[in-house]
Each structure stands twice: as structure tokens, then as C-alpha cells.
């Protein structure tokens, strides 16, 4: 017999997480048992916690498969326009809890595991993150898949099944160390290998010109084997597919030409082909022109396009003969969205298939390609833009280079016709960049070959039209759009912050989960004492829970009553973790100067990974840990200030830290962060934002009201003016005593007594070549932080401001973003209609 439930536990069954019916719980226990014994071949005497996790995962997966098969059958019969989201990154995180939430199984599973003497939360912690992304771009793709399924779109995510995802970060002596992320070591219960759909991908070789046109011959072949992962919509019985390709060597690999005794070597060399899907490149907002990376980009594109065309051609009447030989209808049945330029080779590859294999005239093929493809830009940083050396493409993809040259020739003819005599414009707009090394500008290729080009926040889309893509905007203004990013409220509220989701549902019902604009109804509760109390209580519980987690995992003590000041994102100069550091040191100096004065206690937490080859980013991590070593051990400071570096920041850690945050740091130099999505997660979870007018911060402040936002610093126009005038760090150093003191401490080795010049590179950069103008925003940032502390002293007013932020965060649902892509780019209509469940008649 299980113990009787307390009233509070009984009430928890009235929940956004769905009811636990008795039959359901019994059934789940039965299936759990079956999987433990028959799938995992274990009994309770030898089963490990991981076995129990797998048994639960397979049990939950059973509830997906009927819906998955039914959804795919439905698409086959109805033949809707299909959306293909191509991305080199999908930063999924964990799948178990998200699946339970979307299928309304969470309560029943909780009860079933409890009755079996297991703790579901402990089992959830065993799952490895699927870390197939670096940061925002990959996580956006994952949120988009969730929204596309929730909105009933016939959508597919296509990418690479990296054997090793983003590295695990270990901090040793204050320095970042990288460890391989062997996430598949124990197997992945959520994927289904589909070897029967394996496809060939060609590399190298040469082009033969025949009477029938160009032929790409003498190529090396690598096989692409697909692994499918189900993507469930929110309680609508839709389950879409994410298909990730894995590289396999063909069976005759290197055996055609092996010499006597070369058989063993030929088999060992299969690894070379299979290296294509071995590891994710760990660069965020930085282009590294490596051949293996170019192979990855073509690999995903070539396999995916074959799959798309196979699906387009196959009829819905079950006959194997291709029925559609005419490609006129292709853009009516297929939309391809390019997530940044990484899959840009889809454009020449589709042209190659249409012209060389399907024998379409160039003009017709080009019309089909442009109508099918659309391109999302994610950055304006010049070092992040992909510019592939011509000699690399020529070696690896000789036919594609010819096609790119032809595209360029015809494109420049159009430009010349539109702007006669403007030779410099031709040079600027060419897909081919002349120079010491000839390069292909992949963004230019994407704009020329797409019918829509979008930025990811209003300010970013404007910057594209006014600066890096100005010439293209003048030629084809109709192509340019904005689609402000969003986040899925299923993972980023219901799943990671059930306490908050619950008290919201008690006031306005549960419909907001799939219609986030309904959060506006909370504006009428901004003076409701019981709601104010509930919001503050949930936040305090989340802070206590996160404090306990830090203590358990990292043996760090923090004061849960302090202001939790959090900056978690990739470590990059443009994101200005250094500005945060300068504030922390300034606070420290103020406490030391007036030790008896009252200071609002703060725990500053900074987390994020640095690209392994990015020296400055690694120095920034070392600086944060060095500041922590001084501040956290100074008895004068006590628990008024703590500095914590959050090791190995990833999706599953974000889900823990974001609900506990009081203050969200979004402090990039205006004009550098395309959108940001972490900012939205904090807003939805009841943190206030301190930030510059950059990316989506601008629209968040507009929605919430600037008076409910801590805005500081230069605007884009100010940055431009300062660039024209010339940014001189020295003048800020000379003028601002507190800043000067901080920099002198860094220079003198105050934070690195054993190596006094440890931070000389950082000081030198800040003083002499700081592209991101940290000093220019220092004064306003410090003043703004004083306003933050002052408000935090008044908990009621703080919480009222939090409620206003939560209530106005509805715009930042990825459901809104995807509905706009659907209507304005893909030409399909989203729907919240349910599919019939597997046990219902259609």
C-alpha cells in the first residue's frame, strides 16, 4: 500500500500536466515492467538507475509511436505542402520530460514510478543532453520543431547525427578544459535507425561535358544513414520527424584499388569516410574554413535533397513508380528553410539535380529553386560570415563550383541591367570575392537563390537592409522580412517551471500554453495581493532548489535571499561578460571601501562555453573564476557578494538556473546580438532584464514598457557615431576614477598575485583595441545596476514589475514566430486542430 496523499499532493493532480487516471497508471507500470524485462533484459536485482530510466523512456515512447505512424500516414494521404528545416545544429537537450508534458503523461508517470518505489526526477537526471548545437541557433531550431508540430505543420527537421556533440566543459584551476561529449555511449531510446533509407553522397571527382550536358564522375561515395526522432506537438496527437544523417562507408570502400595485403588497411580507412558525422564544430559566431566542415555542410544537404525529392515524387497511392516527373508543382509542395548559410549548398545542389539529372532548362530550374528556398540570417559579425575558398569547393564539389559561377554570372547581369555603369556595386554584390584567396560568399548565394530573406529581430532585420545587405535590398526589397525569434513555452515554462505554470493556470486557465498571448490577462492581477505573494513564493522556492543543486553538485554555498544576477550564454567579446566583471569588481571595491554600509546582497552567476581556439574567451573565464577566488574568500564581504562560474552550461542546466533568476544580463554592444533567446526565457520565468537596446531586448522593452525594464547604454546610432569619431578607451579610463581603479587592479595582479601579468591581454584589449566598447557603457551600466538594487529592496514593487514582464512576454512564443514563417514565407496555414488519437477513428 502506498501512503495516503497529503491535501497538497492531491491538489497537484489538478494540474496543467494532465490527470493520472487509474487505468493509465496501471498500464504504465505494466509496460515499465515489460520493458525492464523484455527490452533491457534485467530484473530488479541487477537493474541500475539507468536501466530504470531506459524502461521509463521506452514506456513513454510507446505512447508516441501510434501517433507518429498515424501522423505520417495522414501526411501521405493528404499530401500537404511540406516544410523542411535544414540546420547543422539542433540543440535538443533532454527528451523524456518534454515528451511527457506534450503527451499529458507527466502525472501518471510520476504516480507509476512512485508506486514502484522510484523517483521520477532522479530518473530524468540520468538522461544525457542531446547537445547537437553550440548555442542560440541550434536551440532555436529545437524550439521551432516543437512549435511546428504544435501548429500542425507537415514539417521535418534535417541535420547531422553527430557522434560527439558540444564538448563538456570542465573548469580546472580556473581554466576551461574540454572533454568529448560521448552522448550515445549508453544508447539513445528516442531515435530509430532507418538503414533502408540510406542514400549515397558524392565528393571530389571531376566534371565531364557530354552531349547530354554535364556529368559529375569519378567521385568518392559516402553513405548517409538516417536516424529518426519523434517530435510531438502539444496535446494535439501530431508527431513530426527530425531526421539526422550519420555517415557510413560503403562496403567496397577503398577495396576496388587496394594492393596485395591492403585489405585490413582499407577496412580501417572506413573511419575516414565516417568522420563526417563524428563531431560538432564548437564555434559560435565564428567561421573556420575547414574541409571537414564543408563536407558536413554538403553531406546534410545532398542526403536531405534526395529524400525531399523521393518524397515529392512518390505517389500517395502506394505504387513505387515515381508519379511526379514534372517539377512545376515542386514549390507548391516543398518549402526549404536554410538556418543560416550552413546549408547554403542546397541551392547549387538543387540546381544540379534539376539541370543535370531531371533535365530542366536552367531558367525553369532557377525559378523552382528560388521559389522553394528561403534564408534566415543570424549574425552581422564579419568573422562569422561563411566565405569558402574557391580551391576547396573546386576540389570537393567541382560541379557545384561551376553552377555557382553560372548563378553569379546571370545574377550580375541582372544587377548591371538594374544599375547600369555601377561597377563597384557589381564587385560588392558578386558571389565570388576576389583577393589573395578567391572566396565564395555564401550569404550572397543564399540571397540570390531564395525568395525570402529574414533577420531574427526587428532591429537586426533593419541593420541587414541598411548595412551588410543594403545593395541586395535595393535590388530586391520584396525579399526582405523580419521574423523575431521565440521560445517554446512547453519546455521553457511548463516543463522547467511547473510552480509558475501552475499559479498562472489557477488564474487564467491552461489555454495560454498553446496561445501565449493570453498571458496578457495577468495584467489584471498586477495589484492582486494573493497573486503577488504566489509569484514571489514560487521564485523563492526555485532559488532554494537551485541553491541546493549548487551545493550538491559543486559544493558551493550561496545565500538564497540574495539577488540572483545571472548571465548565461556563449562566452564571446560581443556579449560583454567583461562589462559584468567590471561591475562585480566595482561592487567589491565599494563594499571594501565602506564595509559598514548596507549593500543589497548579490550572487552573480556567469556561465557559458568558450570555443576551444578562442584565446580571449578562455581568458574571460579565467578572469571570472579569479574574481570569485578573491571575492568569495574575503571575510569583509561575507555573503553580500558572491561570484560563481556555472560550469558546463547546457540546455538541462538552463532549465534549472533560469527559473531561479532575479536579474537577466543582456548586455551586448548595441547592433551585435541579432536577437537572443535566453533573454525571452528569463522574461517568461519571472526575472527582470538589465540590457542594452539590442536584438529582441528592444521588442521586449516595447511590450513590457520601458519603465519595467532596466535599459542602459548606447543605442545603435550612438555606436555608429562613436565609430565615426573614433572610440578612445583612454579617455574613459582617465575620466572615471572607479573604472581606473578596476583596470589598475587587473593590471597589477590584484586578482592573480602569483602571475601579476596574467590579465595583461584583457587589459591591453580593453584599452587599445576593444571592438565592443566596454568602457563606453560602463558608467551607465553601474548606475543602472544601482537602480536594480534599489528596487530589489522593495519586494512588492519588484514582484509587480515581474508580473508585468511575464504578462507581456506572449509575443516571444516560437508559436507566433512559426505562424509568421508559415503564412509569410512558406505559404501554409497553421492549425490547432487535434489529430485523432491512435485509438480514435479518423
Swiss-Prot record:
Which residues are recorded as modified (N-acetylserine)?
2
Q: Which GO terms describe its cellular component?
A: cytoplasm
> Which cofactors, by name?
pyridoxal 5'-phosphate
Q: At what positions is N6-(pyridoxal phosphate)lysine found?
A: 681
Identify the EC number(s): 2.4.1.1
| Top-tier EC class | transferase
- Report the activity regulation comment: Allosterically regulated through the non-covalent binding of metabolites, being activated by AMP and inhibited by ATP, ADP, and glucose-6-phosphate. The activity is also controlled by post-translational modifications including phosphorylation.
UniProt site (Involved in the association of subunits): 109, 143
Q: Which family does it belong to?
A: Belongs to the glycogen phosphorylase family.
Cross-referenced Gene3D superfamilies, in alphabetical order? Glycogen Phosphorylase B
Q: Which Pfam families match?
A: Phosphorylase
Catalysed reaction, written as an equation? [(1->4)-alpha-D-glucosyl](n) + phosphate = [(1->4)-alpha-D-glucosyl](n-1) + alpha-D-glucose 1-phosphate
Q: Which GO terms describe its biological process?
A: glycogen catabolic process
On whether Cell division is a keyword of this UniProt record, the answer is: no
Annotated positions of the Phosphotyrosine modification? 204, 227, 473
Which residues are annotated with the PTM Phosphoserine? 15, 430, 747-748
The protein here is known as Glycogen phosphorylase, muscle form
Which disease does the record tie it to? Defects in PYGM are the cause of glycogen storage disease V (GSD-V); also known as McArdle disease.
User: What residues does AMP bind to?
Assistant: 43, 76, 310-319
Q: Which domain of life is it from?
A: Eukaryota
What InterPro entries does the record point to? Glycg_phsphrylas (IPR011833), Glyco_trans_35 (IPR000811), Pyridoxal_P_attach_site (IPR035090)
- Organism of origin is Bos taurus (Bovine)
How would you summarize the oligomeric state and partners of this protein?
Homodimer. Homotetramer; to form the enzymatically active phosphorylase A.
Cited function: Allosteric enzyme that catalyzes the rate-limiting step in glycogen catabolism, the phosphorolytic cleavage of glycogen to produce glucose-1-phosphate, and plays a central role in maintaining cellular and organismal glucose homeostasis.
Q: Which UniProt keywords apply?
A: Acetylation, Allosteric enzyme, Carbohydrate metabolism, Disease variant, Glycogen metabolism, Glycogen storage disease, Glycosyltransferase, Nucleotide-binding, Phosphoprotein, Pyridoxal phosphate, Transferase
PTM entry text = Phosphorylation of Ser-15 converts phosphorylase B (unphosphorylated) to phosphorylase A.
Amino acid at each position: 500500500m502506498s501512503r495516503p496523499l497529503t491535501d497538497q499532493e492531491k491538489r497537484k493532480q489538478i494540474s496543467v500536466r494532465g490527470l493520472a487516471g487509474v487505468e493509465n497508471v496501471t498500464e504504465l507500470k505494466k509496460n515499465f515492467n515489460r520493458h525492464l524485462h523484455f527490452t533491457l533484459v534485467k530484473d530488479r536485482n541487477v537493474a541500475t538507475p539507468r536501466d530504470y530510466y531506459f524502461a521509463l523512456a521506452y514506456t513513454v515512447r510507446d505512447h508516441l509511436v501510434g501517433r507518429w505512424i498515424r501522423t505520417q500516414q495522414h501526411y501521405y494521404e493528404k499530401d500537404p505542402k511540406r516544410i523542411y528545416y535544414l540546420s547543422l545544429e539542433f540543440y535538443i537537450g533532454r527528451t523524456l520530460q518534454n515528451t511527457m508534458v506534450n503527451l499529458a503523461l507527466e502525472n501518471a508517470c510520476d504516480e507509476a514510478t512512485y508506486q514502484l518505489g522510484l523517483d521520477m526526477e532522479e530518473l530524468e537526471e540520468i538522461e544525457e543532453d542531446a547537445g547537437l548545437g553550440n548555442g542560440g541557433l541550434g536551440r532555436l531550431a529545437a524550439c521551432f520543431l516543437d512549435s511546428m508540430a504544435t501548429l500542425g505543420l507537415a514539417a521535418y527537421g534535417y541535420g547531422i547525427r553527430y557522434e560527439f556533440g558540444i564538448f563538456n566543459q570542465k573548469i580546472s584551476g580556473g581554466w576551461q578544459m574540454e572533454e568529448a561529449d560521448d552522448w550515445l555511449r549508453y544508447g539513445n531510446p528516442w531515435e530509430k535507425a532507418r538503414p533502408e533509407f540510406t542514400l549515397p553522397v558524392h565528393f571530389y571527382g571531376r566534371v565531364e561535358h557530354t552531349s547530354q550536358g554535364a556529368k559529375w564522375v569519378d567521385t568518392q561515395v559516402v553513405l548517409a544513414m538516417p536516424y529518426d526522432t519523434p517530435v510531438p506537438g502539444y496535446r494535439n496527437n501530431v508527431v513530426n520527424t527530425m531526421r539526422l544523417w550519420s555517415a557510413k562507408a560503403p562496403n567496397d570502400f577503398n577495396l576496388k584499388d587496394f594492393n596485395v595485403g591492403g585489405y585490413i588497411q582499407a577496412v580501417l580507412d572506413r573511419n575516414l569516410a565516417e568522420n563526417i558525422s563524428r563531431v560538432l564544430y564548437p564555434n559560435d559566431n565564428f567561421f573556420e574554413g575547414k574541409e571537414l566542415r564543408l563536407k558536413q555542410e554538403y553531406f546534410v544537404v545532398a542526403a536531405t535533397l534526395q529524400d525531399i525529392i523521393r518524397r515529392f515524387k512518390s505517389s500517395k497511392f502506394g505504387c513505387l513508380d515515381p508519379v511526379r516527373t514534372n517539377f512545376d508543382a515542386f514549390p507548391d509542395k516543398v518549402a526549404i528553410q536554410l538556418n543560416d548559410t550552413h546549408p547554403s549548398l542546397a541551392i547549387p545542389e538543387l540546381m544540379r539535380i534539376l539541370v543535370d539529372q531531371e533535365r530542366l532548362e536552367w531558367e525553369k530550374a532557377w525559378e523552382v529553386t528560388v521559389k522553394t528556398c528561403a534564408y534566415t540570417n543570424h549574425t552581422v559579425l564579419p568573422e562569422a560570415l561563411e566565405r569558402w575558398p574557391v580551391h576547396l569547393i573546386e576540389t570537393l564539389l567541382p560541379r557545384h563550383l561551376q553552377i555557382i559561377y553560372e548563378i553569379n554570372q546571370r545574377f550580375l547581369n541582372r544587377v548591371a541591367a538594374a544599375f547600369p555603369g555601377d561597377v563597384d556595386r557589381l564587385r560588392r554584390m558578386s558571389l565570388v570575392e576576389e583577393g589573395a584567396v578567391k572566396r565564395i560568399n555564401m550569404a550572397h548565394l543564399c540571397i540570390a537563390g531564395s525568395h525570402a530573406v529574414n533577420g531574427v529581430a526587428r532591429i537586426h532585420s533593419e541593420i541587414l537592409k541598411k548595412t551588410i545587405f543594403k545593395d541586395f535590398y535595393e535590388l530586391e526589397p520584396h525579399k526582405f522580412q523580419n521574423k523575431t525569434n521565440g521560445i517554446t513555452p512547453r519546455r521553457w515554462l511548463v516543463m522547467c517551471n511547473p510552480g509558475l505554470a501552475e499559479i498562472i493556470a489557477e488564474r487564467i486557465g491552461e489555454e495560454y500554453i498553446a496561445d501565449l498571448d493570453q498571458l496578457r490577462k495577468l495584467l489584471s492581477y498586477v495589484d492582486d495581493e494573493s497573486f503577488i505573494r504566489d509569484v514571489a513564493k514560487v521564485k523563492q522556492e526555485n532559488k532554494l532548489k537551485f541553491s541546493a543543486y549548487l551545493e550538491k553538485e559543486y559544493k558551493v554555498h550561496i545565500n538564497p535571499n540574495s539577488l540572483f544576477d545571472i548571465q548565461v550564454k556563449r562566452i564571446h567579446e560581443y556579449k560583454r561578460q567583461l562589462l559584468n566583471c567590471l561591475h562585480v569588481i566595482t561592487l567589491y571595491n565599494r563594499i571594501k571601501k565602506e564595509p559598514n554600509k548596507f549593500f543589497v546582497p548579490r550572487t552573480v552567476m556567469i556561465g557559458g562555453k568558450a570555443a576551444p581556439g578562442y584565446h580571449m574567451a578562455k581568458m574571460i573565464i579565467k578572469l571570472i573564476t579569479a574574481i570569485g577566488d578573491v571575492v568569495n574568500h574575503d571575510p569583509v564581504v561575507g555573503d553580500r557578494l558572491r561570484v560563481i562560474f556555472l560550469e558546463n552550461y547546457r540546455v538541462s542546466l538552463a532549465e534549472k538556473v533560469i527559473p531561479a533568476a532575479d536579474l537577466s544580463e543582456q548586455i551586448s554592444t548595441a547592433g551585435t546580438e541579432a536577437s537572443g533567446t535566453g533573454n525571452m526565457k528569463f522574461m517568461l520565468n519571472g526575472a527582470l532584464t538589465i540590457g542594452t537596446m539590442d536584438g529582441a531586448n528592444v521588442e521586449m522593452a516595447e511590450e513590457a514598457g520601458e519603465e519595467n525594464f532596466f535599459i542602459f547604454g548606447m543605442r545603435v546610432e550612438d555606436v555608429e557615431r562613436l565609430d565615426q569619431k573614433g572610440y578612445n578607451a583612454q579617455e574613459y579610463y582617465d575620466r572615471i576614477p572607479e573604472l581606473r581603479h578596476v583596470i589598475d587592479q587587473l593590471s597589477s595582479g590584484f586578482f592573480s598575485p602569483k602571475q601579476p601579468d596574467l590579465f595583461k591581454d584583457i587589459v591591453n584589449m580593453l584599452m587599445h583595441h576593444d571592438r565592443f566598447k566596454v568602457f563606453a557603457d560602463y558608467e551607465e551600466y553601474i548606475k543602472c545596476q544601482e537602480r536594480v538594487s534599489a528596487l530589489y529592496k522593495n519586494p512588492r514593487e519588484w514582484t509587480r514589475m515581474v508580473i508585468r514582464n511575464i504578462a507581456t512576454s506572449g509575443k516571444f512564443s516560437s508559436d507566433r514566430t512559426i505562424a509568421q514563417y508559415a503564412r509569410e514565407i512558406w505559404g501554409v496555414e497553421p492549425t490547432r486542430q487535434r489529430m485523432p488519437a491512435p485509438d480514435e477513428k479518423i
